[in-house]
Amino acid sequence: MEFDYLHLYVDDYQSAHRCYQRQWGFTCVNKIITDQGITGIYQQGQILLLISASESSLSRYADYLQKHPPGVGEVAWQVANWQKIQHQLSELQIETTPVIHPLTKAEGLTFLLWGDVHHSIYPVRSELNQNKTLHGVGLTTIDHVVLNIAADQFTQASQWYQQVFGWSVQQSFTVNTPHSGLYSEALASANGKVQFNLNCPTNNSSQIQTFLANNHGAGIQHVAFSTTSITRTVAHLRERGVNFLKIPTGYYQQQRNSSYFNYASLDWDTLQCLEILLDDQDNTGERLLLQIFSQPCYGVGTLFWEIIERRHRAKGFGQGNFQALYEAVETLEKQLEVP
């Protein structure tokens, strides 16, 4: 199993087109216009990003946007065990709808789960054709997707993904600040190509609760794109006007004081200048998670993006980075006076 594409539902197609092409480095490889609306298909590396805006109040996109702010309204996967998943969906009485892949024209299925986010599955296809014009700013693949969900739905959702998609829990942790908190599980497919995280709030003041309130229900909090050089990619993105979350004061000094980091292999000045988070997985300074998070795209408590570099095949997620992200979002909420 692996990611196929993300589908972003927006109010203003032209504005989104300019943002993701000029700032994020995606190339529009096709455009589909129907009586339902307009859909642009964008590629960078092996990433497919669909962007749709509605031309009809009766379209799927319009229905989503009447309930939620702009965001990821569909996540699609390629699956090898197509018939098995189809049978399980039928047994669970989940209503599915036939769908045609917007680029390959392969037949697939789509169905709704938490927060009006469509889940779509297609047969496994060959890798996307690439050339230098599709390199963009160096984003290569979809690394992981994060779903925020209410606490009373969390266990059901986790068990569903494990039962139907065959994912397993790789990590779980709780993050707390003096004013907020969350619980998170990191799920992954057997081949490791799909990583899908679930977050739920642990109290009413949690920023996950803020997201659920602003999104009017469960939804995709953020998506991470992989890169082989996060410093180069982030430098390009900043030059193009992409804004990222501010890192808490003292973060880098605290990391430099940690005895397990291999100082010689890290360009601390560049990391601090670009505000990139880092987490060591094996206490050698080699298997590093390097991450950075954009500011929310549609106001506080909505979708944002992540850039991630996994050095020496670093796996999973660093709780230290997760804590720093959580504190950075909380600081932003306070600055904007979000209750």
UniProtKB/Swiss-Prot annotation:
Cofactor note: Binds 1 Fe cation per subunit.
Source organism superkingdom: Bacteria
Molecular functions (GO terms): 4-hydroxyphenylpyruvate dioxygenase activity; metal ion binding
Gene Ontology terms: biological process: tyrosine catabolic process
UniProt cofactor(s): Fe cation
Binding residues annotated for Fe cation, in chain numbering: 144, 222, 306
Keyword Plastid: no
Keywords, in A-Z order: Iron, Metal-binding, Repeat
Annotated SUPFAM superfamilies: Glyoxalase/Bleomycin resistance protein/Dihydroxybiphenyl dioxygenase
Residues covered by the VOC domain: 2-127, 141-276
Keyword Transcription regulation: no
Family: Belongs to the 4HPPD family.
Name used for this protein in its record: Uncharacterized protein slr0090
Organism: Synechocystis sp. (strain ATCC 27184 / PCC 6803 / Kazusa)
